[in-house]
């Protein structure tokens, strides 16, 4: 989570890459406090930044982040835009609280720091193709194309208009491996 921990993991992964380049695909979970140097290292090494936008629930004024990190460090958390613009691969997930991926997309597109907000498309891509890549499943999951699993949801409304309301959209249908497993239509 913290900047020192991220640096320590980057050091270890970079050592591993020197010993056996290309042998592994690494990721770091909870990349919440990456500084500029760490973001640059993530981009250069191809290490995936696995982050949980729903953690921004704690980012509000007088929230958990501010109570534990202080205002200055809180302002440096969850730098999604900086990471994406630097070429870092993003993988989004929930980490168990709250689990709803639409809430996480909402958090990524309405982040308290306007400079770190992603577009709906970028956030959805991090939850789908980015997560599949991080889990070594990009050949089966994360996109809808011939030869991949047909796992997807149909939403009641467009998540793009308005993006700020995405967490209020209901799921109309869920399809897993091409079979409808939930249908609220």
Summary of predicted features, one role per range:
Residues 4-26, 30-31, 40, 47-159, ...:
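His/Asp/Glu-enriched, well-ordered alpha-helical/loop segment
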Residues 33-35:
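Short acidic loop-to-helix transition motifs that present clustered carboxylates
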Residues 159-165:
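Short, Lys/Arg- and Gly-enriched loop/turn segments at beta-strand edges
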Residues 165-174:
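Short, compositionally biased
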């Amino acid at each position: 989570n913290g900047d020192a921990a991220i640096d320590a993991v980057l050091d270890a992964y970079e050592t591993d890459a020197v010993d056996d380049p290309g042998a592994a695909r690494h990721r770091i979970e909870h990349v919440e406090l990456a500084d500029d140097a760490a973001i640059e290292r993530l981009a250069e090494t191809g290490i995936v930044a696995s982050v949980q936008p729903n953690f921004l629930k704690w980012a509000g004024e007088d929230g958990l982040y501010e109570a534990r990190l202080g205002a200055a460090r809180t302002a440096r958390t969850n730098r999604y835009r900086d990471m994406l613009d630097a070429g870092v691969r993003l993988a989004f997930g929930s980490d168990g609280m709250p689990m709803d991926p639409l809430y996480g997309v909402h958090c990524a597109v309405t982040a308290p720091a306007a400079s770190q907000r992603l577009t709906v498309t970028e956030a959805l891509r991090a939850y789908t193709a980015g997560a599949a890549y991080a889990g070594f499943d990009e050949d089966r999951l994360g996109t809808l194309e011939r030869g991949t699993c047909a796992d997807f949801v149909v939403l009641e409304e467009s998540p793009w208009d308005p993006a700020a309301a995405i967490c209020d959209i209901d799921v109309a249908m869920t399809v897993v491996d091409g079979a409808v497993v939930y249908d609220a239509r």
